[in-house]
A protein has these predicted regions:
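Primary recognition of RNase H-like, Mg2+-dependent phosphodiesterase/nuclease domains
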Residues: 1-216
Length: 216
């Protein structure tokens, strides 16, 4: 939903999913004790000889105007290339998949042989690592991502917290509202410069997380 002169919550769907997961554990595992802890989160550089691909997606309304984005950085954290796609009207979940597919496509086109993929959408990681996709609406996107991944000799997929994905998070809104269908950024755009500099400096961000303790 979009309100005039007000920014819609781009993370509403993710927040709802996280709260639903917390409810599930509390409702179906009554012997699970949940403790809130504060973690210090930052963007981590890839291993030597690897590049890191961070991707993200957002939908202004879910479904609504959507964008899929990503950033590729080298082992020193330097910006190699970024991108933003205006997808049109779709869900945040599909926008995340578009961002991942575009990012993997760029990695293949650039002949990167070792790629660490990070994104903050655990549900996307679940469908990418699952042998079967039962949702016909996303089958082609998922298949494309899997096929592209096979063309990269060394590749890993990892979930990260939003605080470790700030640069792409900032890009996400740009993708949803930009006029061009697809834009390549050879350097950080102005709206991303500040958070990208924080990543390069290794700045930590605090995040309150739930830690589950299972009792017998």
């Amino acid at each position: 939903m979009v309100f005039k002169n007000k920014n819609s919550n781009l993370n509403l769907a993710k927040d709802i999913t996280q709260r639903a997961r917390e409810y599930f554990y509390c409702a179906y595992f009554p012997k699970v004790a949940a403790t809130r802890i504060v973690k210090q989160i930052k963007w981590e550089r890839p291993a030597r000889g690897w590049v890191k691909l961070n991707t993200d997606g957002s939908s202004l309304g879910n479904p609504g105007l959507a964008g899929g984005v990503g950033v590729i950085q080298d082992e020193e954290g330097n910006w190699i290339v970024g991108f933003a796609r205006n997808i049109g009207i779709t869900t945040s979940f599909q926008a995340e998949l578009w961002g991942l597919r575009d990012g993997l496509t760029l990695c293949v086109e650039c002949n990167f042989s070792a790629v660490e993929v990070e994104l903050d959408a655990r549900s996307v990681l679940d469908v990418i690592t699952s042998p079967v996709c039962s949702n016909s609406l996303i089958t082609s996107l998922v298949d494309d991502c899997k096929q592209l991944a096979t063309r990269i000799p060394w590749i890993s997929f990892k979930h990260c917290y939003r605080e470790a994905n700030w640069s792409t998070h900032k890009l996400a809104r740009m993708g949803a509202v930009q006029e061009s269908p697809f834009v390549i950024f050879l350097s950080p755009p102005v709206d991303v410069t500040r958070v990208f500099s924080s990543d390069m400096l290794g700045v930590f961000f605090s995040r309150e997380c739930l830690e589950f303790v299972f009792s017998a």
